[in-house]
Each structure stands twice: as C-alpha cells, then as structure tokens.
Amino acid sequence: MINEILDKVVRLLEEVRAKKPLVHSITNYITATDCANVILAVGGSPTMADYVKEVEEIASISSAVVLNMGVISDGMVESMILAGKSANKNNVPVIFDPVGAGVANFRNESAEKILSEVKIDIIRGNISEIKFICGLSSETKGVDASESDMNMGNDKKAIVAQELAKKLNCVVAITGVDDIISDGKRNVILSNGHKMLANVTGTGCMSSALCGAFAGASNDYFIAAICAILTMGISGEIAYEKSKGIGMGTFHTSLIDAISMMNENIIKEKAKVTTINR
C-alpha cells in the first residue's frame, strides 16, 4: 500500500506542474507571501484576494480555495464564508486551516461558523486545533499546540483524525513531530520534517497552501494532503542540511528551494510513511 501511495504522490507532483491550478488563498498578512511562493514553487498559480466584493467570483473560477484563520476579523470571516460557499457551488475543493482554534471565543465562534456554512474537503491543523474542532477538550499555546496535546501518542492522534474525518466527511491532516492524515477509512503517519520548521513563522500555513495546490490538481484529497505534507517535511530536512551552521534566513530560503525542486527520486528516497489499520 505504501508503494501505491508514493506512486500516486509522484504522479500528482507531475500533474500539478502540468495543470498549474489556480489556488485562491484567503490567508493572513503574516504568511501571505510565503503561502503564495510555495504554491508557485510546486507549479500552482496563487491569488490572495480577500475583499468581500470579489471573493465569490474568484473562488468560482479557481481550482482550489484555502481558508486560513491566522488573522481573523468580521470582514475576513464573511469573505471566507462567501468564497467557501461559491467553491462548494462550483465543485471547487476547500481547504480549512483553523489557526488558533481553542484560543479565544471569537476565533472559536468563527471556526464553528465557517464549518457550519461551508463544506470542507481538507482540514489541516495542529493537534490542539483539531481536538477543539472535534469537540474535545484541548489546551493551546497561542497558535501552537500545547505540550500535553503534542505528547499524545500517535495512536490517539490517529483516532482523533479518523473520527473528525468521519464527522465532517473530509480529509484531516494533523501536523506535528509526526503527521497524521485520515479520510475516515485510510490512515497514515508521515515521519519526515525537522524541528527547525517550528522556528519559521507560517510553515503550517504553507502546508495548508500546498494542500490547496495539490487538491486543485486531483480528485483524491487524501493523496493531495499526503503529497503536501510530505513535500513540506522532506523539504524541511533538505533545507536544514543546506543551512546547517549558517542561520534561519538561509533555512527559510532553502525551504522554498527544496519545495520547488521536489521530484520522484527525492520522494521515493526520503519519504517515511506508515499505514494504520483501524
């Protein structure tokens, strides 16, 4: 099964470069540039429009829509819901990144409102955010997962991912030291990445943007999420090796470089994928 998954990941890497999907990303001003750059790096075409009077139209002609709650406001929530509904109407996949869910009441209410009005195809977050969305008690550290949540075993995280995937009828990606991806039936653990990724603002947001790029070129959103998270994790490892002893700026640049150079040989040499039978 793992070889089959990796074959599909490799094909999708090629397809996204051939199709150049338009990815409509409503994200935050902290990470917008990096999100746009990683979409470009894998072969997609980003648009970052968030004005309420144009998001419906742009979402309707896009290949994927990414909704990111990094910086939230009444106007941003309205734009996200309008874009999401337009995407649903036009069979465009929607990726949701509930940044900081569980931190504050307005953010929590916003996440719940988006989920109640928009059909989500992929939801990506850390374990604390996903536990909150799943209706479980969770602790957060700003927009980061709490230490107690991060210390949950992979088996328990997989149960959370699978249950939420069934509940929302979508793909769930929990990212962390190990990444858990589930569509409610298929479940995998991805063990790539490097701790330096946590020291760069927005690598989670970039992962969600990559989910949009790959979902925009595929009907299998489980494989799209795997492709996105593997690309980020492996690129983090490569970037660390290239920037070791130099500094964070070089790591950041090397990360984008590695994403842009991802290919079949790198995937098949470095991917660490484990299936979970549940």
Swiss-Prot record:
It is an enzyme of class 2 (transferase). Its EC number is 2.7.1.50. Catalyzes the phosphorylation of the hydroxyl group of 4-methyl-5-beta-hydroxyethylthiazole (THZ). Belongs to the Thz kinase family. Substrate binds at M48, G202. Keywords: ATP-binding, Kinase, Magnesium, Metal-binding, Nucleotide-binding, Thiamine biosynthesis, Transferase. It comes from Clostridium botulinum (strain Eklund 17B / Type B). InterPro entries: Hyethyz_kinase, Ribokinase-like. Pathway: Cofactor biosynthesis; thiamine diphosphate biosynthesis; 4-methyl-5-(2-phosphoethyl)-thiazole from 5-(2-hydroxyethyl)-4-methylthiazole: step 1/1. This is Hydroxyethylthiazole kinase. The keyword Signal does not apply. It comes from the Bacteria. ATP binds at R124, T175. It catalyses: 5-(2-hydroxyethyl)-4-methylthiazole + ATP = 4-methyl-5-(2-phosphooxyethyl)-thiazole + ADP + H(+). The keyword NAD does not apply. One of its GO terms (molecular function) is hydroxyethylthiazole kinase activity. CDD domains: THZ_kinase (cd01170).
